[in-house]
Amino acid sequence: MPWIQIKIITSKQHDNLLETLLLETGAVSVTFQDAGDQPIFEPLPGELKFWDDIEIAGLYEADNNLHEHQTKIAAAINKIKAMCEPGQHFIYKIEHLEDKQWEREWMIHFHPMRFGQRLWVCPSMQAVPDPSAVNVILDPGLAFGTGTHPTTALCLEWLDSLDLQNKILIDFGCGSGILAIAALKLGAKQAIGIDIDPQAIEASRDNAQRNGVSEHLVLYLSGQEPKNLQADVVVANILAAPLCELAGVIADLVKPDGYLGLSGILNTQSDKVSQAYQHAFCLYPIAEKEEWCRITAVKNKNDGI
């Protein structure tokens, strides 16, 4: 089925009203993205950040009711124009889109990737480049983590560099489960994934089953993990603000002499995150990839944050 897409560029104060108007005129989905190039870093707990200028896209079915949809869209545009105050900009365009299986379309451009010396992440639809390597089979899905982002790549390269034989690893903020699964395939005897998102737990479980390691992966929604839980290796690829806020919680998960890997950190945020952990850990040199970095450390025998 072909589709009609209306894209609107305007100020952020119209976001809720525009979303309502698009849905009321028959849009089957409404998405938001940055209309310019404004970086938005992670919000503090309870804070909601949004771009100043937004692009809102409404997607409509181009079926037998095409004329009706176009009439409704035109009416919506007129309403939106009337809302704009003098000096506020409003740009829109209407596009006709061919029908595609969008997830499959994205997967066409997702190729096998190598991390370190042993580890590959490969989509299920493509041949594994090196069958003798450590291969994680992973497709794009609902939860974060396929290896394409620099922070995930930094964590995978670090895991590949470790001797994980018979080790227990905690993946704090597990997303797709890619780091926990990679650790198991690299020799860890058990991996524990923790996340605040039920979709991440589901995605991690499905991906572990696909990779044949589900028996060795334990998953918890955040807050439901056992007390006094500890592991030989802890990796947390989240964001700088929660890494700082939860420094005590994350540090307690690492056994004395255990290893910690942190990412989701911009290069400009590395000092702040390092300071949150330096009292309990001996920090290694920071690794960088593009504008992102990874902090690694070993826990002191007598720690305290």
From Swiss-Prot:
Subcellular location: Cytoplasm
Keywords, sorted A to Z: Cytoplasm, Methyltransferase, S-adenosyl-L-methionine, Transferase
GO biological process, one term: methylation
GO molecular function: protein-lysine N-methyltransferase activity
InterPro entries: Ribosomal_L11_MeTrfase_PrmA, Ribosomal_PrmA_MeTrfase, SAM-dependent_MTases_sf
Listed EC numbers: 2.1.1.-
Annotated source species: Hamiltonella defensa subsp. Acyrthosiphon pisum (strain 5AT)
Disulfide bridge partners, by residue number: none
Family, as annotated: Belongs to the methyltransferase superfamily. PrmA family.
The UniProt record lists the keyword Cytoplasm: yes
EC category: transferase
One GO cellular component term: cytosol
Catalysed reactions, semicolon-separated: L-lysyl-[protein] + 3 S-adenosyl-L-methionine = N(6),N(6),N(6)-trimethyl-L-lysyl-[protein] + 3 S-adenosyl-L-homocysteine + 3 H(+)
HAMAP family (alphabetical): Methyltr_PrmA
PANTHER family associated with the record: ELECTRON TRANSFER FLAVOPROTEIN BETA SUBUNIT LYSINE METHYLTRANSFERASE (PTHR43648:SF1)
Residue sites binding S-adenosyl-L-methionine per the record: T152, G173, D195, N237
The gene coding this protein: prmA
Name of this protein: Ribosomal protein L11 methyltransferase
Biological role: Methylates ribosomal protein L11.
